[in-house]
Curated annotation (Swiss-Prot):
It is found in: Cytoplasm. It catalyses: (2R)-3-phosphoglycerate + ATP = (2R)-3-phospho-glyceroyl phosphate + ADP. It holds the Pfam family PGK. Pathway: Carbohydrate degradation; glycolysis; pyruvate from D-glyceraldehyde 3-phosphate: step 2/5. This is Phosphoglycerate kinase.
């Protein structure tokens, strides 16, 4: 990967705009999982230490584009950064026509999705971002698969566009896992976004020795085996695709599950066989027998790619499957890479961050990289490095 790296530049006195991935869960004005901010801190601190005029920005959540909405403000992130850096951090709301930043100061530019044209990679907006800085640092691997104004367009127009340390590290770690993985390689794909991940399963089936499915994806495979899945989250129109995958590769489908009659934190869990699911029930976790079977597979792996929990781990009664799988990954000797927002939250919950070889901040980008797709923001950095 031939890109300019931030670590090769002298940033002293320069206006530096860092596009980080600070899209973290927030509850009642407080950050509830700080993994992505923690991952971005070294980049921010490096720029501050060099005496740069540092601006950092990100998206957070899915606000209506072009409209300010306090619920999606980066203020909780600013408060977190003040605390962690033990220094003042300003939040700039109106910054597109310029913002004053002192050397060694950090200013957070409000949620990029409050700007009209962000998602469409609007050229006028991209040029405004570019005019704010002397050096643009793309450090948000999690959004590198999206060609948007703050990830792709700005890199096209900034005087200098480079990769931040986190982005460079992510690409190196994923490259290592995918180009020459130690075998056997096990890939776990879980979570609730089913359709976006079934295509990934196809790509992974060609490089992984063993595929594991969980969450909403597993429900589609349970349905593909002819079982009733009741009110479970699954994709009826992808059942044939799941059948095809079952025919071409070895995918262990859950044989026992935890179900409930409502999707709620307090719903009692019933453990049962996949052959006994009633119309009014929904699968919210895999059962112990299924989870332990996966743990056994993970024990013998040499490379593990993990994207997505295997159940609704946010609900205490439906946490056990994900916990069994997470602890098996933590205890494995394999080179393990975990990616995706829900996966990071699960890692935090079970306190196993130090037992995972590499934690990727990307969700969709992680999966697209795994699929071998070109990430637009990275492609733009490569193009700029040639000039």
């Amino acid at each position: 990967m031939s890109v300019i790296k931030m670590t090769d530049l002298d940033l002293a006195g320069k206006r530096v705009l860092i596009r980080a991935d600070l899209n973290v869960p927030v509850k009642e004005g407080k950050v509830t999982s700080d993994a992505r901010i923690r991952a971005s801190l070294p980049t921010i601190e490096l720029a501050l230490k060099q005496g740069a005029k540092v601006m950092v920005t990100s998206h957070l959540g899915r606000p209506t584009e072009g409209e300010y909405n306090e619920e999606f403000s980066l203020l909780p992130v600013v408060n977190y950064l003040k605390d962690k850096l033990n220094s003042p951090v300003r939040l700039a709301k109106d910054y597109l026509d310029g913002v004053e930043v002192a050397e060694g100061e950090l200013v957070v530019l409000e949620n990029v999705r409050f700007n009209k044209g962000e998602k469409k990679d609007d050229e006028t907006l991209a040029k405004k971002y570019a005019s704010l800085c002397d050096v643009f640092v793309m450090d948000a691997f999690g959004t590198a698969h999206r060609a948007q104004a703050s990830t792709h367009g700005v890199a096209k127009f900034a005087d200098v566009a480079c990769a931040g340390p986190l982005l460079a590290e992510e690409l190196d770690a994923l490259g290592k896992a995918l180009k020459e993985p130690a075998r056997p390689m096990v890939a776990i794909v879980g979570g609730s976004k089913v359709s976006t991940k079934l295509t990934v399963l196809d790509s992974l089936s060609k490089i992984a020795d063993q595929l594991i499915v969980g969450g909403g994806i597993a429900n589609t495979f349970v349905a593909a085996q002819g079982h009733n899945v009741g009110k479970s989250l699954y994709e009826a129109d992808l059942v044939d695709e799941a059948k095809r995958l079952l025919g071409t590769c070895d995918i262990p489908v859950p044989t026992d599950v935890r179900v409930a009659t409502e999707f709620s934190e307090t719903a009692p869990a019933t453990l049962k066989s996949v052959t006994e699911i009633k119309d009014e029930e929904q699968i919210l976790d895999m059962g112990d027998v299924s989870a332990e079977k996966l743990a056994e597979i993970l024990k013998n792996a040499k490379t593990i790619l993990w994207n997505g929990p295997v159940g609704v781990f946010e609900f205490p009664n439906f946490r056990k499957g994900t916990e069994i799988v997470a602890r098996a990954i933590a205890e494995s000797d394999a080179f393990s890479i975990a990616g995706g927002g829900d996966t990071l939250a699960a890692i935090d919950m079970f306190g196993i961050a130090d037992k995972i070889s590499y934690i990727s901040t990307g969700g969709g980008a992680f999966l697209e990289f795994v699929e071998g797709k070109v990430l637009p923001a990275v492609a733009m950095l490569e193009e700029r490095a040639k000039k």
